[in-house]
Swiss-Prot record:
GO molecular function: identical protein binding; N2-acetyl-L-ornithine:2-oxoglutarate 5-aminotransferase activity; pyridoxal phosphate binding
Domain of life the protein comes from: Bacteria
Protein name: Acetylornithine aminotransferase
EC annotation from Swiss-Prot or TrEMBL: 2.6.1.11
Pfam families in UniProt: Aminotran_3
Organism expressing this protein natively: Parasynechococcus marenigrum (strain WH8102)
Gene: argD
Positions bound to pyridoxal 5'-phosphate: G118, A119, F151, D242, E243, V244, Q245, T299
Reactions accelerated catalytically: N(2)-acetyl-L-ornithine + 2-oxoglutarate = N-acetyl-L-glutamate 5-semialdehyde + L-glutamate
Record-listed N6-(pyridoxal phosphate)lysine modification sites: K271
Keyword Nucleotidyltransferase: no
UniProt entry keywords in alphabetical sequence: Amino-acid biosynthesis, Aminotransferase, Arginine biosynthesis, Cytoplasm, Pyridoxal phosphate, Transferase
Note: May also have succinyldiaminopimelate aminotransferase activity, thus carrying out the corresponding step in lysine biosynthesis.
HAMAP family recorded: ArgD_aminotrans_3 (MF_01107)
Amino acid sequence: MVDAADSKSAGHWSWGFKSPGSHPEAVMNTYNRFPLTLVRGRGCWVWDDQGRRHLDAVAGIATDTLGHSDRALRRSLGRQLRRLQHVSNLYRIPEQDALATWLVQHSCADSVFFCNSGAEANEAAIKLARKHGHLKRGIDRPRILTASASFHGRTLAAVSATGQPRYHQGFEPMVEGFDYFPYNDIHAFESLLERHEANGPAVAAVLLEPLQGEGGVHPGDAGFFQRLRHLCSERNILLILDEVQVGMGRSGRLWGYEQLGIEPDAFTLAKGLGGGHAIGALLVNAKADVFEPGDHASTFGGNPFACTAGLTVAQEIQRRGLLRNVEERGQQLQQGIQGLVARYPQLLQGVRGWGLLQGLVLHQDCGVTAPQLAKAAIEQRLLLVAAGATVLRMVPPLVISANEVRQLLRRLDATLAELV
């Protein structure tokens, strides 16, 4: 099922775009790419180099908060480029101050460190946790507890924190000091904590996602997180949340921790913060703020351009009432997927998620994997992304309309019908 509009070009764009002298093999082979070249976007839609229009439920993997080529971002970033693009953090940066102020005014944090990505934000959090362990708990070799099936990034400490052995293979030895327990399992956590601390303080921090995205779209359990918060507070262990994927409104709340009824000591952001532009952040409360000048730094982090993008996204979320849209469209999407689960019980097991981060769960023995389903959906001009072998993730821009959700569901229905 492909709309006629999907085959029409728009405006005066040259659909035969090709970079002069370009050689795809010049790009290092680190991605399993789909056979699709995207050259233009507007809102929730992207066009390929053949002029075909696709509904984008990937959004740069939960990154294009306001959709593609957003007017507010175009205007603010155009002005910023004409004024000042980058200066060193050796000097005060007004745009950085403005974004940090907005973030602390709208969260439980008291201060912000800016960087360029989620992995960098988590690396900063890991350094913060270790220093806290040394200074506040007197630990010589601090440990950090994270969850099985978690995902915290590809840099070495971040991937060591990631509780998925497949990401470790070939890159050993991992950074020491990380231990894993089953997500949402408070008894397993308490057992691991007691084992480590039987002879005194040993754990500096717990690092968790409020909702595990890459690991299969598993929402956090509020009861688990509330008990965890209590245990961490009792021992002065930092509770750090990786909000890289759910932060900035994707869950239907501004922050994922609001879904859980807790406040962390620190949390990390990236992805949706810049609306498609590279920015990451570590946000901390006063208790956790142990960094001093020279402890950590970033050349590009907090530059005027990136912070203008972040502040524009934040202000547009407020101005357009996007949290309400996420909640309403998320309910519409989840209910629609439930209907598809009932229609294709031989393929589909269920759906789980928050807001506009929904995971369609396939039966393990259905003969189709999530990556295969994502590839098949391209034929219906629908872009989706897998979260493991059996979960198909839908993370469209937060501006998606009710009609676009209906189109997403129709295209997904048509894809499934072809596979039965």
